[in-house]
Amino acid sequence: MNAAYGWSLGGACLPRFLALGKIPVERAVIDAGITPYRMPLILRRLACLRDNLGFRLIAKSRKVLETVYPPERWTMPGRDPVKEYDALAAYLKTYSKRTVRNIFWSANNYTLPTKPAEMGCQITYWYGEEEKQARHSNICFIKQYFPRAQLHEIPKMDHAELVMMYPQDFYRRIMEFLTHTSAAQNKRS
């Protein structure tokens, strides 16, 4: 496979996909991907409960939703923030408690081999400057588990903001990564 990209919860799938090495990947972007918790089971269960309650609070309260994700920042230009947030609030209410619990549990508690498969994949881990503290354990995990991975902090961005709110900038950055790694691989050949 030429390239793989995973963002947030999808970014939780990509480290496992790469670690197993069943399908060779030349380059990969893990965009604020969630890595497995490295703590005792009881603490992982408490973390899952915290995440679940946080999601439910946001899903039940429009005021909390707009406080955590201000519409003026998280609405695409030219779109009506009221309509966008009405649709988002309605959508968030469609998730069952069990679905939310399963999403958070599986994103934070997947197993990985002791060492990732050797495949020569060029890996970069992207995260927003404003989410650096929240991603701290993920960044440490990536540096330890994939020691050759490059870390890339995106200025003035929060979680998933680049891909959701700035698609042209996302495209430019992803193409830069793909063409830069291609050029580097061609030089080695």
What do the predicted segments below correspond to?
Residues 19-56:
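Flexible "cap/lid" loop of the alpha/beta hydrolase fold
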Residues 157-168:
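Catalytic histidine-centered segment of alpha/beta-hydrolase-like enzymes
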Residues 129-134:
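Acidic catalytic loop of the alpha/beta-hydrolase fold
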Residues 4-6, 31:
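Short beta-strand immediately N-terminal to the catalytic nucleophile in serine-hydrolase-like folds
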Residues 119, 125-127:
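Short beta-strand/loop motif that positions the catalytic acidic residue
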Residues 121, 135-143:
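Short alpha-helix in the alpha/beta-hydrolase fold that links the catalytic acid
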Residues 39, 60-117:
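Conserved alpha/beta-hydrolase catalytic His-Asp/Glu region
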